[in-house]
């Protein structure tokens, strides 16, 4: 018997059921890589950020996440070059789905018990997503805005339900507005740290603040 279609597991009906010592024998998720492109690009290299945002409360299978990741990556590599972007899949499939296998061969009615003992065996994993939750983000240079929108639009077709594409007002993957970001870096209130930044508050020892601004 093959894998059951993902439409059977689309809705969030039950409580989260993660892999644990009580829920064993869970097959590995199809998606293993969540960051691709130029992951180590400094925060000031990729100011533009686009998000794919879910418009439904549903479950997305690990196979669908992997298909969307491959689709977006292939388009971005073709249009921006392999070092011109950074894609991050923001969902992780932790919820385990089950299947109560039924025999469909001749004489199966003598072997199986129908709905007696119907708690199934683990079949795969899905990610539970809420309305307004980000599924996938891409950061890149400002001139690649159309390519980001097109890559996310193509990746949308791999998912059920409805998603929206949103170009963020923030700088890259940070939580600071793009129009304030460069001023805050110049004032040394933000220190670039990989693909993120460290925020330096105006509190703390005065000599530490003087050493930073000297």
UniProtKB/Swiss-Prot annotation:
Numbered residues of crosslink Glycyl lysine isopeptide (Lys-Gly) (interchain with G-Cter in ubiquitin): 188
Positions where Citrulline occurs in the chain: 32
Entries under InterPro entries matching the protein: Ribosomal_uL16 (IPR047873), Ribosomal_uL16_CS_euk_arc (IPR018255), Ribosomal_uL16_dom (IPR016180), Ribosomal_uL16_euk_arch (IPR001197), Ribosomal_uL16_sf (IPR036920)
Pfam families: Ribosomal_L16
GO MF annotations in UniProt: structural constituent of ribosome
GO BP terms in the entry: regulation of translation; translation
Primary role: Component of the large ribosomal subunit. Plays a role in the formation of actively translating ribosomes. May play a role in the embryonic brain development.
Protein's recorded name: Large ribosomal subunit protein uL16
Natural source organism: Oryctolagus cuniculus (Rabbit)
């Amino acid at each position: 018997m093959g894998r059951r279609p993902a439409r059977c597991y689309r809705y969030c009906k039950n409580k989260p059921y993660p892999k644990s010592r009580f829920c064993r024998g869970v097959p590995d998720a199809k998606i293993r890589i969540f960051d691709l492109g130029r992951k180590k690009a400094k925060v000031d290299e990729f100011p533009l950020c686009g998000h794919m945002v879910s418009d439904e409360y549903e479950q997305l299978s690990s196979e669908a996440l992997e298909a969307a990741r491959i689709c977006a990556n292939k388009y971005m590599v073709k249009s921006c070059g392999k070092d011109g972007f950074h894609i991050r899949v923001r969902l992780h499939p932790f919820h385990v789905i089950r299947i109560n296998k039924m025999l469909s061969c001749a004489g199966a009615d003598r072997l199986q018990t129908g709905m007696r003992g119907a708690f199934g065996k683990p079949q795969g994993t899905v990610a539970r997503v809420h309305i307004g939750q980000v599924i996938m983000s891409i950061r890149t240079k400002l001139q690649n805005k159309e390519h980001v929108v097109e890559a996310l639009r193509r990746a949308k077709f791999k998912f059920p339900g409805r998603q929206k594409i949103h170009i963020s007002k923030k700088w890259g993957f940070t939580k600071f507005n793009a129009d304030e970001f460069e001023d805050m870096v110049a004032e040394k209130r933000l220190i670039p740290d990989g693909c993120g930044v460290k925020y330096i508050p105006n509190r703390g020892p005065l000599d530490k603040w003087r050493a930073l601004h000297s």
